[in-house]
Amino acid sequence: VEDDPYGDLYFDQAPPASLLSLSASVPGSRDWLAHCGSLSKVLCPGLRIGWLIANPELLARATMCKQFSDAHTSTYAQATAAQYLRSGVMPQTLARVRAVYAKRAQAMCDALRSELGDAVEFVQPQGGLFLWVRLTGATGQERDANALAKRAIEQGVAFVPGAPFFSQNPDPSTLRLSFATADEERIREGIARLKKAFKA
């Protein structure tokens, strides 16, 4: 299963080839691949349009599950998405969106470095909407993301503790920060509030 809602949200260099594109050169591999994508992350959060590329048997079963779940995706939303995609402006939209998210990601990384220093570790994101952070516990700082989350809320900022994202052996020192909706100034303010939560 290749779940790829953020694949088009790269900042500088395009990501490595998807399994879907690689499957074209490996005979029979498409029969074993299920590729999922979405417009809600790259175009409009309220436009709940996604797709599944898979073998016919899996598609038939997925269609049945979808129909039992909610009958079908809004016809209006589908028509709106189709018209937009036919218009040919998606490449320009993606370029603008990538530039916005790249600036937000940079602002978050810069703020984390200046405000929290060695209390956190992270890899600068090359795309997407999130930053994965590990609390180091340096100089006696917090290492428990759940405990920090409670204090962060008291400071007026929130994040998602990382443990639920693990399929096994969750790491309680991890957290996921989002730069999707806040502008650069609000991101800096949020990280400053997170610093206060460390000291609370």
Residue map of PLM features:
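PLP-dependent class I/II
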Residues: V1-A200
